[in-house]
Regions:
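Short beta-strand "wing" residues that participate in macromolecule-binding interfaces
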Residues: 60
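Amphipathic alpha-helical dimerization/coiled-coil segments
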Residues: 1-3, 24, 72-96
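Short, hydrophobic-biased segments on the C-terminal half of alpha helices
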Residues: 49-50
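Glycine-centered, phosphate/nucleic-acid-interacting loop/turn motifs that mediate DNA/RNA or nucleotide
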Residues: 56
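N-terminal helix-turn-helix DNA-binding core of bacterial DNA-binding proteins
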Residues: 2-41, 63-75
Length: 96
């Protein structure tokens, strides 16, 4: 996992919103389901999902003709822990 890639993917508000939507679904979702009501074109949602997948925060599985997307909770949690640890080290050094 590349922490830089994760934060770069999450820096875009639409991708972050899409990640939250995937997390809220609690079950695998298709691109068309995730695009519904988002006001964003299906192809754009698909590109955003590809970037999130490349960053490792979501995974996709092909079932027949459909591709289903789910949150990689462990990756998100591990990334946030790495950030917290890095900040804790920085803050601890400043307190010395």
């Amino acid at each position: 996992m590349n922490i830089d890639k994760v934060f770069k993917a999450l820096a875009d508000p639409k991708r972050l919103s899409l990640l939250v939507r995937v997390a809220e679904e609690r079950s695998p979702s298709t691109v068309s389901h995730l695009a519904k009501g988002s006001g964003v074109d299906l192809s754009v949602v698909s590109r955003h999902l590809a970037m999130l997948r490349e960053a490792g925060v979501i995974k996709c599985e092909k079932h027949g003709k459909e591709v289903l997307y789910t949150l990689q909770t462990d990756v998100v949690v591990r990334t946030l822990r790495q950030l917290a640890d890095a900040l804790e080290c920085c803050c601890a050094e400043k307190d010395l």
